[in-house]
């Protein structure tokens, strides 16, 4: 994206610095449109969209005239200038960081060229805004009249701008590719140099580690074996103690179970004796009550049979 902005703005400024009053007799056809498929680069796609916008401006339609009259084009250009300068500055800093592994002389030269290009870019964009303001005044003066002359001048200017735009963008792409290749080559050389410097240190560290492992490894193994045996003895001791406690708990449980069974037997015998005692208490009472009830019933029945039948009373 940063390469795209640099290519776009530099090429645009190169075309705008040309003479606006160039010869109109050169009516050569416009350069062919570049393909905008998925295989094309992002900057190529944006250049194509920019050229579509320029073609739209060239039509001098009602919308184009309206935007020229209300200074919308100049406002959008101002925003674009600010964003472009930010992108150029960020890209320059990033490229200088990538060129750090290169030689100091080369790095200083490239940095100086980039700073000079950035300064020229700011000056040229300011000039572009002034030219556009002047061109807007001409459009305002000619609106309502015949726009054929204005359209012809704009068509000629756009053809020249198109050529320079493509040429400068291609040149900038090649320059940036060279700088990027130099940065990559310098980075690879720097990494190789660092690797060569670190290789003896790594080998020395590996040798020391092997020696230290030989010297320290055996004592550590002996100590680990002693710890293992000590731990094994403690585990066995703990196991014996745990087994003794389990045996004692099992014995206590057996004693508790025996006592519970004994107490259960005693309670059962006491319950049976209490039941027999209750039976001996209540059985005579029940038999006596049964005899008394039978006698009472017998007396009632006898009284009913012996009573004379009397006629019913008249009062009834």
UniProtKB/Swiss-Prot annotation:
Positions glycosylated per UniProt: 211
Places the protein is found: Secreted; Secreted, Extracellular space; Secreted, Extracellular space, Extracellular matrix; Extracellular vesicle
Region (LDL and other lipoprotein receptors binding): 157-167
Modification sites for Phosphoserine: 146
Ranges where the record places region Specificity for association with VLDL: 277-289
Principal location listed in the UniProt entry: secreted
Gene Ontology process terms (BP): acylglycerol homeostasis; cholesterol efflux; cholesterol metabolic process; chylomicron remnant clearance; high-density lipoprotein particle assembly; intermediate-density lipoprotein particle clearance; lipoprotein biosynthetic process; melanosome organization
GO molecular function terms noted in the UniProt entry: cholesterol transfer activity; heparan sulfate proteoglycan binding; heparin binding; identical protein binding; low-density lipoprotein particle receptor binding; phosphatidylcholine-sterol O-acyltransferase activator activity; phospholipid binding
Protein name: Apolipoprotein E
């Amino acid at each position: 994206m940063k390469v795209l902005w640099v290519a776009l703005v530099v090429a645009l400024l190169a075309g705008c610095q040309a003479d606006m009053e160039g010869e109109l007799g050169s009516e050569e056809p416009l350069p062919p449109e570049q393909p905008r498929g998925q295989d094309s680069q992002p900057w190529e796609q944006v250049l194509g969209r920019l050229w579509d916008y320029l073609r739209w401006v060239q039509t001098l339609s009602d919308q184009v005239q309206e935007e020229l009259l209300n200074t919308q084009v100049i406002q959008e250009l101002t925003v674009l200038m600010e964003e472009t300068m930010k992108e150029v500055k960020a890209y320059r800093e990033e490229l200088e960081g990538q060129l750090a592994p290169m030689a100091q002389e080369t790095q200083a030269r490239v940095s100086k060229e980039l700073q000079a290009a950035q300064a020229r870019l700011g000056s040229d964009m300011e000039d572009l805004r002034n030219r556009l303001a002047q061109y807007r005044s001409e459009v305002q003066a000619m609106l309502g009249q015949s726009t054929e002359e204005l359209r012809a001048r704009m068509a000629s200017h756009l053809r020249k701008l198109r050529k320079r735009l493509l040429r400068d963008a291609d040149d900038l792409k090649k320059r940036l590719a060279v700088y990027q290749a130099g940065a990559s080559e310098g980075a690879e050389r720097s990494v190789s140099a660092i690797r060569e410097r670190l290789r003896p240190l790594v080998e020395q560290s590996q040798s020391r580690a092997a020696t230290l492992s030989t010297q320290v490894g055996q004592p550590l193994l002996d100590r680990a074996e002693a710890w293992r045996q000590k731990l094994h003895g403690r585990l066995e001791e703990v196991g014996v103690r745990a087994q003794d406690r389990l045996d004692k708990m099992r014995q206590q449980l057996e004693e508790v179970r025996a006592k519970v069974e004994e107490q259960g037997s005693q309670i059962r015998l006491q319950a049976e004796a209490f039941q027999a005692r209750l039976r001996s208490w209540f059985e005579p009472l029940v038999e006596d009550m049964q005899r008394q009830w039978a006698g009472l019933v017998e007396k009632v029945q006898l009284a009913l049979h012996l009573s004379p039948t009397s006629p019913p009373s008249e009062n009834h």
